[in-house]
Amino acid sequence: MDDSLKDSWVPEGPISKTIRERIEKSGKRFHANDNISEYIKDGELEKLQEEVQEKMQALLSSLVIDTEKDHNTQDTARRVAKMWLREVFGGRYKPMPKVTSFPNMGYKSMYTSGPISIRSTCAHHFQNIVGNAWVGIIPNGEVIGLSKFNRIVHHIA
């Protein structure tokens, strides 16, 4: 195709390359535990999920798994891609939840929330991490509602 006829807005290569270049241009890092949500534009997470799905299908093929005839693995690539982007690494691709604080009305003791279930992944081996967390704070000038602890823990995990 004549280069002059190409649409200038169509990105070259996979969406992951476009996002990666955007982050590199900003001078920020994108390590496994970093939140990169500010660099993902509307509609790109869906494209990234499709890309991961294609690569997951290739991985299953390389593992010599018959995803066409084995009913257990039909559509597994789609399910795994969705799980990795929306759940396991969800805090990487979504902004931190909004946390509203309120004036402390003189409460001086520690208050806690837990157990809060944690499902995460080790950034070194991609091994599942499953457990519970308890969060406790001694309030100062401001306090937050107990439900916010769950949101923060789930985002960070």
Indicate where each model-derived feature is located:
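Active-site loop/lid in soluble adenylation, ligation, and acyl-transfer enzymes
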Residues: 2-132
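Histidine-centered catalytic/metal-coordination loop motif
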Residues: 66, 121-157
